[in-house]
Every structure is written in C-alpha cells, then in structure tokens.
Regions:
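AMP-binding adenylation
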Residues: 1-169
Length: 169
C-alpha cells in the first residue's frame, strides 16, 4: 500500500535485505503540471547520458520563490571532473528533457508560467552524507529513501549548502 520502489541488495539467511529507491506516487505540482517522480528520474537519467556523466543521484527543488517558478535539478555525478562541466549546457539539456517528459511543463514554460529549468551540481558524496545524517538521527538505514523532491526547508538548506561552488553559474 505504501507504493515504494525497492531493490534487493542482499540476504540475511533466507530473508532479503531491501533498499528503498523512491516513492512511486510522489509528484511536483507548482501550477497544475503534476510531474511524477518517475518522470523526474527519467529526465535525470537522460541528462546524465547526454552529458556523458555517471549519475549517482539527483534531487529536484520546485522553486516557487523564483519568478517565474522553475524546476531546479541538483545532480550528483560519480567521479566527475567538476571543472569540466558546462553548467549552462547542462541546464539547457535539463530544460529540454523536462519539457519532453511533461508537455504541461513545456507549454507552461513557453507561456511564461515557468522559467526554464536549471541544473546545479552537488559535491561528491552529498547523498551519502544525507543518509549518514539520517542514521545518526536514529533512522534505520534500510528505511531511508533518497531525496528526489526537495519538499522541506531542512532538505533545501542541506542540499543547497552542498552545491559545488566551483562551477556555480
């Protein structure tokens, strides 16, 4: 009933050890566009593939404080040369893939309801640090879900503090 996507990461005897990947029915809905987490994931995977980077994980911040509102992708890449990443090009690809993934977002960007999506790059190990902090606060490691939608101020402060300032545009 929880609608979580899980992956078996091992066994303890005959009992499988599960890792939560994401909640299946989480959505971003700033202006009625209803972008699902599955669409957000597909966009992240396509952006990484097009940029030739290995994606560790991603988060999306639906920034309603920016005028007009916009999607802000926070990417963590595996052993990427951050100095070689063209942030403007990464943002362009991200916006293009998001528009292709959700036609409402495309239409609303064209009519000015949304600003084009942007991309930011997180420091290495950001997502592991989030997991470690949750464990330190008493959460069971196998119950911690990756943060794909930044939906609280605590998550926003954490992830935005770990944006790689060397390539910030």
């Amino acid at each position: 009933k929880m609608r979580d996507a899980i992956r078996c990461v091992g066994h303890k005897g005959t009992m499988p050890t599960m890792e939560f990947l994401f909640r299946l029915d989480q959505t971003v809905n700033m202006h009625g566009e209803k972008t699902t987490e599955l669409v957000l994931r597909k966009v992240a995977d396509k952006v990484a593939a097009r940029a030739g980077l290995d994606l560790v994980d991603f988060s999306v911040y639906p920034n309603v404080d920016h005028h007009p509102a916009r999607y802000e992708y926070l990417f963590e890449f595996y052993h990427a040369d951050h100095a070689a990443i063209d942030l403007a090009e990464l943002s362009r690809i991200t916006d293009e893939e998001l528009r292709a993934g959700n036609y409402d977002v495309s239409y609303m960007t064209e009519d000015g309801t949304f600003a084009p999506a942007i991309a930011r790059v997180l420091q290495d190990e950001t997502n592991q640090l989030w997991r470690d902090m949750r464990v330190m606060h008493g959460k069971a490691p196998n119950q911690i879900k990756p943060v794909h939608i930044v939906d609280t101020e605590q998550k926003r402060r954490f992830f935005f503090a770990l944006i790689d300032g060397e390539i910030e545009g």
